[in-house]
UniProtKB/Swiss-Prot annotation:
Disulfide bonds: none annotated. The lineage of its organism: Bacteria, Bacillati, Bacillota, Clostridia, Eubacteriales. Belongs to the acetokinase family. Pathway: Metabolic intermediate biosynthesis; acetyl-CoA biosynthesis; acetyl-CoA from acetate: step 1/2. Its EC number is 2.7.2.1. CDD domains: ASKHA_NBD_AcK_PK (cd24010). GO terms for cellular component: cytoplasm. This is Acetate kinase. The record marks H180, R241 as: Transition state stabilizer. Coiled coil: none annotated. GO terms for molecular function: acetate kinase activity; ATP binding; magnesium ion binding. Substrate binds at R91. It is found in: Cytoplasm. Pfam families: Acetate_kinase (PF00871).
Amino acid sequence: MKILVINCGSSSLKYQLLDMDTQTPIAKGLVERIGLPGAVLTHRPADGEKEIITAEIPNHTVAIQLVLDALVNPEYGVVKSLEEIGSVGHRVVHGGEKFASSVLITDEVMQAIEECIELAPLHNPPNIAGIEACQKLMPGVPQVAVFDTAFHQTMPPHAYLYGLPYEFYEKYKIRKYGFHGTSHKYVSQRAAKLLNRPAEGLKLISCHLGNGSSITAIKDGKSIETSMGFTPLEGLMMGTRSGDLDPAIVSFIQQKENLSSDEVNDFLNKKCGVLGLSGVSSDFRDIEQARDQGNYRAALALDVFSHDVKKYIGSYAAVLNGADAIIFTAGLGENSAEMREAVVDGLQYLGAKLDLEKNKVRGKEADISAPEATCRVLVIPTNEELMIALDTLDIIQKG
């Protein structure tokens, strides 16, 4: 079966068409600047040259029509007809408490996703637009929703509740939800295979480190604690997000800078993190380069970040009562040997120790632990699209 995976942002759309017999993509691509001038589709067949298609793309329906046209194009397409596509899997950012797993999309499911808009006002509306476009353009093809939050629905109340009046949870559903769930789920499953152990009994700490970063404690294959919270702003300092703060700082900044609540929220999401501390960039590669050239603030930003990661690993080791493995994934986790070394240095008490030669790996699955390490350190490139496709296949096969 071939499964189309769709990930819609407000003005962009990423897609992959996967052959589930081999679990590999046969085409992937990106639509940029939806609803803006200069919209473009970049289409990459697995065994061909990339195609760049410029067009007026006023909305997500037009974007998906372009994608479908590209997939069946006689020159650079990869299928003879759309009938070869058995199902569509959609990334949906927020499923609230309503969804603890991926689901076949029905009218009731759509309504529930719409009810979660206030929890993810920037993300859920374009996710919904993508689903509606596919329903219109591919009638009769089963559509599946895969939620970023679902994997974390196994967290116990003592992990997801804040120190606020309980009525705020009852009335407004204020609690920790966690994100990057699809990524954490995928790498935890791969880790069990790499360690040649069943998920049951395994204690894992998964570090998804990139422009957005989160850490998850995984026990018996289930998330029991995670660093992102009610929104993706909580937890680690990130590319442009502040991460954990004393809540009183928010009103202090509002008063000092004369900002509205929307403006201060935007500021904490887009102008803080390593960008704010370094003054250089939100891209860790640029910051590592600046540090190597003697930039003090760049070095400081990297030190704060690695300290943050180490602190969370330590606290999650406490929650798990030890760890069998620490996983590094996502752009920074997969590719920065220096960051991995900075984080693991000082975790010897956990039994974690790097083999510095093995740690040079970039973007490939590897056990980078020293032979004597009792807590393994793994690099596992994430593959959220494959995880979405596998969940979609599972639901279609269950009927």
